[in-house]
A protein has these predicted regions:
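Alpha/beta-hydrolase fold catalytic core
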Residues: 4-75, 97-99, 137, 313-328
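Conserved alpha/beta-hydrolase catalytic His-Asp/Glu region
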Residues: 177, 198-253
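Conserved alpha/beta-hydrolase "acid-adjacent" motif
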Residues: 270-276
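Conserved HGGG/HGGXW glycine-rich cap/lid loop of the alpha/beta-hydrolase fold
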Residues: 60-114
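Short beta-strand/loop motif that positions the catalytic acidic residue
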Residues: 257, 263-265, 269
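Active-site loop/oxyanion-hole signature of alpha/beta-hydrolase fold enzymes
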Residues: 107-143, 309
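Flexible "cap/lid" loop of the alpha/beta hydrolase fold
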Residues: 157, 164-194
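Catalytic active-site module of serine/aspartate enzymes centered on a nucleophile-bearing elbow/loop
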Residues: 287-328
Length: 328
C-alpha cells in the first residue's frame, strides 16, 4: 500500500465531515439572523429565584455540586448533555413551592469535577446516589431529561429502594430498541469538532427548541444562548457525556423498573425521536406518556407552567393511588 495516500475509509470520513459542515451552515445563518449579534439579553426567567449556597458531595474522588431548595417530598432534577443546574431555572422555583428540590451539576459540567476518561450512565447514577446520601435523603422522586432520563433509569435499576417515582423527559430506552437520532442532529454532532464553540451553541439552541417557540418567542432562544455562553463546558467533557448517552443500553432490564413513571415528550423534538416515548412506555410496566404538542427537546423551557403542572399532578395522583388499600 502507498503510505503517502490516505486510506479509503479516511477519505470517506473526510467527505462526510465536509457534507455535515455544509448541512449546518444554512440553519446557523438563519438562527444568527433571528438572534442577532446585538440582540438584547435579559437573564430573568419565569419562576427563577435566588439559589441557596452550593453544596458539595463526593463519589470517590469526584466532587459533585448541588443545591437544595423548598420543603416537602424530595424531588431530584437531573440534566442532560451540556447543561448544568441552571437548566432548571424556568421550573425549579415553582416546583420548590411543593417539593424539596435537588438540582445537580453532573460530572463534567458546572461546579462539579470534570474527571478525565470515559463516563457512563451507571457512573453518573452513582453520582446522584452520592448527592442523596450527602443530603440525608433516603428516598426521592426523580425527574431526568435526555441523558438525565437515562441516568434516572440506571438509578432506579441499581438502587430501586431510593427511587419513589420517575418522570422521564425527552429520553430514550437505550440499546437497539431506541429510535435513531434525527438526521439533522446527527450531522451537527459529526460537524461539532469542526465548528467554533459559539457556532455550535447557536445550532444546538435551534435544535433543542421547537420551531413554534423559535418563531414566536425568540427571547427564549436568546436566554438559552446567554446561559450556555455564561456556563461553558470543556469539549472533552461534552464528548464524554455524549458518549455515555450513546452507550446507554439497559439490555432488557427495564421490566424491573416498577415505580410509577410519567414519560413526557415534545412532538417537535429534533434531538430525540418522539417515537421513543412509546417504545419506552412499552418496556416499563407502570408508565404512561404525556405529549406536549409542538414542543421541542427543552419543553420545560418552552412550556414551564404546563411542565410544573404535569409533574405536580402526576406525583399527587401516584401518591393517592399508592395510599388506596388493595383488596384481596
Amino acid at each position: 500500500m502507498d503510505g503517502s495516500r490516505a486510506p479509503h475509509w479516511a477519505i470517506q470520513v473526510g467527505r462526510r465531515a465536509r457534507r455535515a459542515r455544509s448541512a449546518v451552515k444554512a440553519p446557523l445563518r438563519q438562527l444568527g439572523r433571528r438572534l442577532g449579534p446585538r440582540a438584547p439579553v435579559r437573564l430573568r426567567l419565569p419562576g427563577r429565584s435566588r439559589e441557596g449556597p452550593t453544596r458539595l458531595a463526593r463519589n470517590g474522588p469526584v466532587t459533585l455540586a448541588y443545591d437544595l431548595r423548598g420543603r416537602g417530598a424530595p424531588l431530584v432534577l437531573i440534566q442532560g448533555v451540556g447543561v448544568g443546574r441552571w437548566g432548571w431555572e424556568p421550573v425549579a422555583a415553582r416546583l420548590a413551592r411543593r417539593f424539596q428540590v435537588i438540582t445537580i451539576d453532573n460530572r463534567g459540567i458546572g461546579a462539579s469535577d470534570t474527571p478525565p476518561g470515559r463516563y457512563s450512565t451507571r457512573m453518573m447514577a452513582d453520582d446522584v446516589l452520592a448527592v442523596l446520601d450527602d443530603a440525608g435523603i433516603q428516598r426521592a422522586s426523580v425527574v431526568g431529561t435526555s441523558l438525565g432520563g437515562m441516568i434516572a433509569q440506571e438509578l432506579a435499576l441499581a438502587h430501586p429502594e431510593r427511587v419513589d417515582k420517575l418522570i422521564l423527559v425527552a429520553t430514550i430506552p437505550g440499546g437497539p430498541r431506541s429510535r435513531p437520532m434525527p438526521l439533522g442532529t446527527t450531522y451537527l454532532f459529526a460537524a461539532a469538532p469542526f465548528m467554533t464553540a459559539k457556532a455550535k451553541l447557536r445550532e444546538l439552541v435551534q435544535r433543542t427548541l421547537g420551531p413554534t417557540t423559535l418563531r414566536r418567542r425568540p427571547r427564549v432562544a436568546r436566554r438559552l444562548m446567554a446561559r450556555k455562553l455564561a456556563h461553558p463546558q470543556p469539549e472533552s467533557a461534552w464528548r464524554a457525556q455524549t458518549a455515555a448517552g450513546m452507550l446507554f443500553n439497559p439490555l432488557g432490564r427495564q421490566r424491573r423498573i416498577t415505580q410509577p413513571t410519567l414519560i413526557v415528550q415534545g412532538t417537535a423534538d429534533q434531538v430525540v425521536d418522539p417515537g421513543n416515548a412509546d417504545v419506552l412506555a412499552g418496556l416499563l410496566p407502570n408508565a404512561r406518556v404525556q405529549r406536549f404538542e409542538g414542543a421541542g427537546h427543552l419543553l420545560y423551557w418552552e412550556r414551564p407552567k404546563r411542565f410544573v403542572r404535569a409533574v405536580t399532578d402526576f406525583l399527587a395522583e401516584a401518591a393517592a393511588e399508592a395510599s388506596v388499600p388493595t383488596t384481596a
